[in-house]
């Protein structure tokens, strides 16, 4: 068998290293081509319409059931009244509206808060905004058939979660800490099932109702985050 001298071995190693480097460069290019085009979608485009209805800041993954946007007239509106768990049309008719609130509100008064356009983040896969009146940061992430809200309370006021009264079966707090309810519209019925944090937190909350609102209040228990 013919032996390989030192010079030939060195050349082989160089060729191998060049091949590995070339493969690594090509691999990086392949990874770059797999970037999801959703990252280029800006939900804020079309938020102001001079003549027709504006588009909404919709947080919605392609081909998914959950569509959320903050309830306000359009992008110029400086106040938010609630966040729906989903919508039944592309720009209206919200379902299962909720709103985090810090501190106490008078009975029969729906919450409303100013927001800061410069602090809002909106992508099809993630949303975040700051409620100035309540000092709460709201985060939302959609999935195909569900969504996750996270409410970050920044002050030491009482933690409340406003639940807009439903057109069907009202909100019900189950013994396992889950929330259920239904909405009726155009001869159809939508259902909601929600879990809030963990049982040891939600079991300390109660649902209070007035003529237009339902509330979950944590009283003296003040978790920094509720989701």
Task: State each model region's role.
Residues 4-5, 19, 145:
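A generic "functional-site adjacency" signal
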Residues 9-18:
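Sec-dependent signal peptide recognition
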Residues 30-227:
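Accessory carbohydrate-recognition regions in carbohydrate-active enzymes
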